[in-house]
């Protein structure tokens, strides 16, 4: 009981301020986040990740992508119908690309609160999010432009 309570407190703290270690590589941080989500939901799915090796993102994009990975992994783990969940991040000079894909049960064409909130946040940042559901496969594609001025402003603050 105590261990479960401690875990829930850590998760709530992480919700308000992500557990992002400044000296730890993002691929390792994001993989740790996914592992915690899989453990929390007692998922038996295999989560295959493709992240650039030892990549870095300027602030605030490191935390923004952390939140996107958190929501995508949580959605996939909770609603996947089994099989493999794949999560890919690709970073270019001017944009971040994220793709999540998993098997799913046939569902109604509605977004849950998590995906709706994620869509709204991405839109505010000038990005795009597309959702595809075909042959019992659920795929989310995100394109998030990197605004260098936002990075500089965050650095100055």
Regions flagged by a language model, labelled:
Residues 138-148:
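Short C-terminal beta-strand
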Residues 62-84:
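Conserved ATP-binding N-box helix of the HATPase_c
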Residues 147-157:
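C-terminal end segment of the histidine kinase catalytic
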Residues 3, 7, 18-43:
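Short beta-to-alpha transition helix within the HATPase_c
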Residues 96-105:
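Conserved DxG motif in ATP/Mg2+-binding regions
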Residues 108-139:
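ATP phosphate-binding glycine-rich loop and adjacent ATP-lid/helix-beta elements
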Residues 44-69:
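Conserved short strand/loop->alpha-helix "switch" segment adjacent to the catalytic nucleotide/phosphoryl-transfer site
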Residues 84-94, 132-135:
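Short beta-strand/loop element within the Bergerat-fold HATPase_c
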